[in-house]
Each structure stands twice: as C-alpha cells, then as structure tokens.
Amino acid sequence: GIFPKIIGKGIKTGIVNGIKSLVKGVGMKVFKAGLNNIGNTGCNEDEC
C-alpha cells in the first residue's frame, strides 16, 4: 500500500540524513582539530 512506502521512504531519508550529519560533524571536528594544530606551531603533540 501507500503507507508502508511512505514509512520506508521516511526511514531511508532519516538514515541518509543521519549519516550525512554524522559525516559533517566528524569532518568539522577533524577540520577544527587541524586548525588548532596549525595554530599550535603546526604539529601534533606527539611530534612536538
């Protein structure tokens, strides 16, 4: 019927959006960490 299709679509969209936002969140964290490293003499703590 129509309703299972809508529900299935909603779940798929939800999962896709969840993954996208997760990737974005991780990407931003990595990006910010990279900027922080550049700000802090441009090396990781282990390498300094």
UniProtKB/Swiss-Prot annotation:
Main subcellular location: secreted
Subcellular localization: Secreted
Expression by tissue: Expressed by the skin glands.
Record-level GO cellular component terms: extracellular region
Keyword Disulfide bond attached: yes
Cysteines engaged in disulfide bonds, as pairs: 43-48
Keywords noted in UniProt: Amphibian defense peptide, Antibiotic, Antimicrobial, Disulfide bond, Secreted
Any Gene Ontology biological process: defense response to Gram-negative bacterium
Biological role stated in the UniProt entry: Antimicrobial activity against Gram-negative bacterium E.coli.
Family in the record: Belongs to the frog skin active peptide (FSAP) family. Brevinin subfamily.
Protein name, as recorded: Palustrin-3a
Organism this protein belongs to: Lithobates palustris
